[in-house]
Amino acid sequence: GKCNPSALFQAPITTSISKEAEKLAQNLSAEVRGSDMLIIWTDCDREGENIGYEVAQHCLSKRRNLVVKRARFSAVIADQIHRACMNLVDLDLHAVHAVDARQQIDLRIGAAFTRLQTARLVPLLHVDRMVISYGPCQFPTLGFVVDHYRRVQAFVPEPFWFIDLRHKTDTHSSAVEFIWDRKHLFDEHIVKILHGRCKEAVEAQVTCVQCRPTSKRKPSPLTTVELQKNLSRLTGMAPKKILDLAEALYQCGLLSYPRTETDQYDNDFDFVGLLDKQRQDAQWGALVSELCASAAGATVAPGALKYERPRNGRKNDKAHPPIHPTAHANDLRADEKKVYDYVTRRFLASCATDALGEETKVCIEMGGETFHTSGLFVKDTAYMKLFTYEHWSNKSIPEYRERQRFRPSTLTVKQGCTCLLYTSPSPRD
């Protein structure tokens, strides 16, 4: 029937068992008749707590004296299941009511604004029997998409100019590119004046040569957002599909619970025990054995991997640890293997050390303008032997000395153009 959309904010809400869940409810009713205790084993997040409460309420309606307890775990593995069973707790009613409140807010806002939009917009569109729905989560996201689209459409590329200085030596096959410290300017005339001063100077002079140790940080503990973002970029899989596959692997006992924003491990987390389960793997088993030997205090051979506890982040939801492998896996399907391999390699790499190198920075001056370049010598790729999704390569440059003078092999003005830092939307049909 018809009603004022605002009335839906006060209308009573009724709950019932859906047709799809009727057999499940019947099964619970039958099982609870001869039971004294109900243990809730749903996922250990707010949604799982709410579902567990619904199950408990249904069972209590059939057996009032039933004892209800909650098992908390993060992975479907024997150790955690036994520990959860020995440390049963009560349901967290705060989490239950929080989900109830969110569901009611979503329902009321969605129903009210859907009715309002449909009533006001359908006559303007001259269509019949059309519903224009509103979702409290989806609508703001749609706003981001529209805003992004408008920025892309409004973007106007702007030309800029810069000085391109290169130096070719007999010791290296390719010329060294020196980056202008001003980067670029939007006034061609000014750039040409500065370029002219450089040409008048004829020679460039080395003003500074600095060598310093540098490193590339190993990956941090894995959260849901990082898993979806990085693996989607690496494989092209949709973020939802990645999470669905991770949940399937969790249900098989191969991964920990994949819905977590925690990037910190507890102090008593058993890293070595999980590493030991991966020693049999044909791809990374030998490298994991090096980590295990290092963790046990054995003398590490030159070039071998060294164990180091993962570096903690800043977030801890106190519910689940970061995503990690809980068992070794064999015979996975193609996409499942991509998800499992990424999670496992990232966990293993987080237990190794940072990659180490030495960076050389060279600064020069020519005609009052300053330029710089840098070289890199990688000493130890460390964690990247396991985390093959990242690379760090040597960048060789000639040996320069302070106050050394040389003539550039290239000294020109080049033009560039500003561009969007994100991909433009594909053409519409």
Give the location of each predicted region.
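Long, highly charged, low-complexity internal segments
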Residues: 1-17, 129-247, 251, 284, ...
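Intrinsically disordered, low-complexity regulatory segments
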Residues: 1-113, 304-309, 407-417
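C-terminal or mid-to-C-terminal helical accessory/interaction module adjacent to the motor/catalytic core
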Residues: 80-160
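Conserved, well-folded catalytic cores of nucleic-acid-processing
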Residues: 31, 58-62, 84-91, 107-115, ...
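Hydrophobic heptad-repeat coiled-coil signature
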Residues: 426-428
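Extended, well-ordered alpha-helical scaffold/bundle regions in very large, multi-domain proteins
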Residues: 237-305
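Catalytic phosphate-handling regions of large nucleic-acid enzymes and associated NTPases
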Residues: 250-278, 308-327, 354-355, 361-373
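Short glycine-centered, acidic/aromatic-flanked micro-motifs in structured strand/loop junctions
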Residues: 42-44, 229-231, 259
